[in-house]
């Protein structure tokens, strides 16, 4: 769920998790359209696409099991849908951590009107 995703982000970036990314660029937060503005926004685009492929549960509300082991996020071995959601969140959190150098404060609260020409998943 979103709380768990926020914990993963915090662990991988040292930031305040979702609060640092919830209104970033064209894809971080609810919905999304346009071309990702940078590598950080692309992490959100890929995450949105991943959620779009999940079947059988609501990715934003589903509670899954995971742990942190030696700095790595490890998803539990539960039913397919929950494991898929966890993997989407895990990959995105790692992506944010790997692309912190592209995070640009000018893309926080970015105007959705500027987001055009959508990419395809």
Curated annotation (Swiss-Prot):
Keyword Transmembrane: no
Swiss-Prot/TrEMBL cofactor(s): Ca(2+)
Compartmental location: Secreted
Enzyme class: hydrolase
Cofactor details (free text): Binds 1 Ca(2+) ion.
GO biological process: arachidonate secretion; lipid catabolic process; phospholipid metabolic process
Residues that bind Ca(2+): 27, 29, 31, 48
Primary site of residence: secreted
Alphabetical UniProt keywords: Calcium, Disulfide bond, Hydrolase, Lipid degradation, Lipid metabolism, Metal-binding, Secreted
Gene3D superfamilies to which the protein is assigned, alphabetical: Phospholipase A2 domain
Single GO cellular component term: extracellular region
Tissue specificity annotation: Expressed by the venom gland.
InterPro entries hit by this protein: PLipase_A2, PLipase_A2_Asp_AS, PLipase_A2_dom, PLipase_A2_dom_sf, PLipase_A2_His_AS
Swiss-Prot/TrEMBL catalytic activity: a 1,2-diacyl-sn-glycero-3-phosphocholine + H2O = a 1-acyl-sn-glycero-3-phosphocholine + a fatty acid + H(+)
Listed EC numbers: 3.1.1.4
CDD domains recorded: PLA2c (cd00125)
Active site (record annotation): 47, 89
Disulfide pattern: 26-115, 28-44, 43-95, 49-121, 50-88, 57-81, 75-86
GO molecular function: calcium ion binding; calcium-dependent phospholipase A2 activity; phospholipid binding
PANTHER family: BASIC PHOSPHOLIPASE A2 PA-11-LIKE (PTHR11716:SF101), PHOSPHOLIPASE A2 FAMILY MEMBER (PTHR11716)
Purpose: PLA2 catalyzes the calcium-dependent hydrolysis of the 2-acyl groups in 3-sn-phosphoglycerides.
Similarity section: Belongs to the phospholipase A2 family. Group II subfamily. D49 sub-subfamily.
Protein name: Acidic phospholipase A2 PLA-2
Organism of derivation: Eristicophis macmahoni (Leaf-nosed viper)
């Amino acid at each position: 769920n979103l709380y768990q995703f926020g914990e993963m982000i915090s662990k991988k970036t040292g930031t305040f998790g979702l609060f640092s990314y919830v209104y970033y660029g064209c894809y971080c937060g609810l919905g999304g359209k346009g071309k990702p503005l940078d590598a950080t926004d692309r992490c959100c685009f890929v995450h949105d696409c991943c959620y779009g492929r999940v079947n059988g549960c609501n990715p934003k509300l589903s509670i899954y099991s995971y742990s942190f082991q030696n700095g790595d996020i490890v998803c539990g071995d539960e039913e397919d849908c929950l494991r898929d959601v966890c993997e989407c969140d895990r990959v995105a959190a790692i992506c944010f951590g790997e692309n912190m150098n592209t995070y640009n404060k000018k893309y926080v609260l970015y105007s959705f009107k500027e987001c055009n020409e959508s990419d395809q998943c």
